[in-house]
């Protein structure tokens, strides 16, 4: 199991962003068990909740064990308190960062599957809202979406944009 902490330079956010990555790359094989087939990893982009940070999933859950048991790469970016939506006036395009840039960068850096059906996005609270919004907006990238207690008081979203509302109104 590899646990990687890094800072990525984001063009969409105009700054570096802390990101944690879990890769079950050096998984121990028990004697008599078949070796792992060498193929790109299925990947979960996992978003934290408001007032949290990119370490919450590692320190407060069993995500590392889950990743190892399911041969799953997990990418956990810092989302500040952005709701993972674009704020072009402030040059904080978190939606584009999570839905496009982060996926492209991590696929270049790590052996991650490029298949839609192997690429998931999920989150808790604010991250759950961001996962649903960006999973729908970037539906050509994400095959599955998980929203855990998604914070969907859309009228009260900070820096709400018409784009945010339009994504939820689509069927």
Residues covered by each model-derived region:
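Non-catalytic cap/lid and distal C-terminal segments of serine-dependent acyl enzymes
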Residues: 1-171
